[in-house]
A protein has these predicted regions:
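Alpha-helical scaffolding within the catalytic cores
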Residues: 55, 66, 70-74, 102, ...
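Short, conserved secondary-structure transition motifs
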Residues: 32-51
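Intrinsic-disorder/low-complexity accessory segments
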Residues: 2-7, 11, 15-35, 84, ...
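Aromatic- and acidic-residue-enriched segments that line the glycan-binding/catalytic groove
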Residues: 49-67
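Active-site metal-binding loops of divalent metal-dependent hydrolases
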Residues: 2, 43, 120
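Short acidic/polar alpha-helix capping motifs at helix-coil junctions
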Residues: 65-70, 142-146
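Active-site-adjacent "subsite" loops/lids of carbohydrate-active enzymes
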Residues: 74-89
Length: 297
């Protein structure tokens, strides 16, 4: 979980860790033989600690199912942000925060095939996942969109089997690279979960039923297991598409062929160095030119 007050994803991650370690199911054992699974339950520990303190302060002796109450709305400073009150899910491309820098460094090292980003949304909502709707960034390989549909179909079928409410797309678009969608530019399929937020006590829904926090965690947990199974079945084909796409992007037929971007020197060396360091952190190659050149648009 990247937002500290959206806790069901982090708690589901703990269940996933236990399941992968303890299970003797053949499917799980085969998965562990063939895959490297990296689980980072809490990207924002400071925000989660702040949210946990709010729960401790505002919780009563009996569960409060009214989502208008303080335990559900919280107060400032909210747990969404990190210690510096920065929303980490806007920072993937800019790398201004230490948490983001560490996460991006890990992604660059392992180059995962998929990345799951578990969130929460309004308490009267249900569950949303991909595929995203338009606008979709035109610099993303079509193969990632294709595979996103495959993963979404498997996940949706599992939800249907369990009679769980969910929807896809709607307000979820893949355009701005400051979100976790940023990984698509590295050839990784980003998968978003948005679970209605229960704030641990649960919430009374319009039809009168109570949705528990346990259910929220279970939705995130099952989604992850399904996504891992889909990856296991399609990993080789995804690698082939990744290889073909990367090879084409550096070929003479690519729209990116024969292009260079020149950063002109200025008197502000500090800003120039900051830009250069951010580009290098994103594994963008930089060369220093010492010769006279001419350029045209």
């Amino acid at each position: 979980s990247i937002h500290g007050n959206e806790t069901s994803g982090a708690d589901a991650a703990l269940g996933i860790i236990y399941h992968l370690i303890a299970s003797q199911d053949k499917d799980v054992l085969d998965m562990l033989k063939e895959m490297v699974i990296i689980i980072d339950p809490v990207m924002n520990p400071d925000g989660r600690a702040r949210f946990a303190k709010n729960l401790e302060q505002y919780r009563g002796t009996a569960p409060n199912y009214d989502d208008q109450s303080l335990i559900h709305t919280g107060d400032w400073p909210y747990g969404r942000t990190n210690h510096y009150y920065f929303d980490l899910n806007r920072d993937w491309v800019y790398l201004t925060q230490p948490e983001t820098q560490g996460r991006v460094s890990l992604i660059n090292e392992w180059k995962p095939q998929i990345l799951v980003d578990a969130h929460e949304m309004g308490s009267q909502d249900t569950f949303m996942t991909g595929p995203a709707r338009e606008p979709i960034n035109k610099n993303v390989d079509y193969d990632l969109i294709k595979w996103g549909n495959v993963f979404a179909k498997d996940q949706g079928q599992e939800f249907d089997k369990r009679n769980w409410r969910f929807y896809t797309g709607e307000w979820h678009e893949d355009l701005y690279p400051g979100y976790s969608f940023y990984v698509a530019f590295k050839g990784t399929l980003g998968i978003l979960y948005e679970q209605s937020r229960m704030a641990e006590d649960g919430v009374r829904r319009p039809e009168g039923t109570i949705q528990s926090y346990k259910e929220s965690v279970h939705h995130q947990y099952v989604s992850t297991i399904v996504n891992l199974k889909t990856l296991k079945e399609n990993s080789k084909a995804m690698y082939e598409d990744y290889w073909d796409g990367r090879k084409f992007n550096v070929s003479s037929d690519s729209k990116y062929a024969n292009r260079s971007y020149v950063i002109l020197p200025t008197k502000n060396n500090g800003r120039l160095n900051v830009l250069a360091n951010k580009l290098k952190a994103q594994e963008i190659e930089i060369y220093k030119n010492n010769k006279q050149i001419s350029v045209s648009n």
